[in-house]
Amino acid sequence: MTGFRLSSLPAIVVLALLLIVALGRAGLAQTPAAPAPAPALPPQLITIAETRAIIDGAIAYARERNWRMGIAVVDHAGDLIAAERMDGGSGRNPRFAEAKAFAAAMYRQTTETLGALYKTRPDRYFGIINMYGNKVYLVGGGVPLAVDGKLVGAVGVAGLPEGEDEKAARAGIAAWEKMRPAQR
């Protein structure tokens, strides 16, 4: 039996093995790279800080009037970012608020407008309700959020006297608009 000889390997294989060993040792001597910074949010998303400003602005509107409500903020796709119920408010209000926000995001209109359209053309807008089931609520209180004409989300408010849900949602949006230049 003959022993293994380095000279019996083709020269290219020997060079490849030496290169692998050299690179492996060089890699061990290097310090690990710092982790990459977190990527910036795409422009179609709103931050949790922006969401908090919307919620706080709407709640301040309700508190000034000694009312209780639920509020929800959804992203551009209608997915929930956050929902809250004020102390003493109905447990159903955040769900109704989310359904209003979802409808406003999906159809890029206020739920007040959608509700009026449903009344004039129920055959056309009945499909909205059938398509999404209880995820849409076509009464006032859902308002889309846009930046530079592009939808970034929507706000829904529920539980206030008639006509006041949308005003509270708009108060939240006004608070968001004030803080946005500092955030982006």
Tell me what each language-model feature is.
Residues 10-26:
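Bacterial N-terminal signal peptides
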Residues 28-184:
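Flexible, solvent-exposed loop/hinge segments and secondary-structure transition points
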